[in-house]
Design a protein with these regions (language model features):
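Short secondary-structure junctions
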Residues: 56-63
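Conserved N-terminal beta-strand and adjoining loop/helix that marks the start
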Residues: 1-17, 38, 69
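Active-site-adjacent beta-strand/loop module that shapes the phosphate/pyrophosphate-binding cleft
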Residues: 60, 70-93, 102
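Conserved hydrophobic "DFG−1" position in protein kinase catalytic cores
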Residues: 11-12, 19, 86-88, 103
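NUDIX/MutT-family hydrolases
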Residues: 85, 94-125
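Conserved Nudix-box catalytic region and its N-terminal flanking loop in Nudix hydrolases
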Residues: 16-55
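Generic C-terminal helix-cap and adjacent flexible tail
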Residues: 1, 126-137
Length: 137
């Protein structure tokens, strides 16, 4: 089975990083995650992430370096998660396509209920704290 390609962004503000909460009724409904979404056919990962963040949060971002690649063998469909550091270029994040959003500190990230594909990123960020945070906006 082919893996589902997904792009996510790490967006920071000071010592906090942006997380979003999935809508109720969605897969992993009301779980927290790093904002992003599926990469459509023929779409480049960075373009997909820019599109998803515009749709879901109303922001335009500069997609920077690749922070982490995670493969998670989900029961229903394997997931290939590409996580990029991002910087907001325009707009203020609003929960347009998500249940809610929150800016969290390093010590808070480990306590969030996240989908399994996000666990390696969650652990890395909480373990390394602000040292591994994305470049400041």
């Amino acid at each position: 089975m082919r893996a589902l390609p997904v792009a996510a962004g790490l967006i920071s503000e000071g010592e906090r990083i942006l997380v979003t909460r999935r809508k109720k009724g969605a897969s992993y409904g009301l779980f927290w995650e790093f904002p992003g979404g599926k990469i459509e056919n023929e779409e480049e990962p960075r373009q997909a992430l820019q599109r998803e963040l515009k749709e879901e949060l109303g922001i335009r971002v500069e997609v920077r370096d690749l922070f982490e690649v995670v493969f998670y063998n989900e029961d229903t469909c394997p997931v290939l998660l590409l996580v990029f550091r991002c910087r907001i270029e325009e707009g203020i994040p609003e929960p347009r396509g998500v249940h809610e959003l929150r800016w969290v500190k390093p010590e808070e990230i480990a306590g969030l209920r996240m989908p399994p594909a996000d666990h390696p990123i969650q652990k890395r960020l909480s373990r390394q704290g602000a040292r591994s945070w994305p470049e400041r906006s």
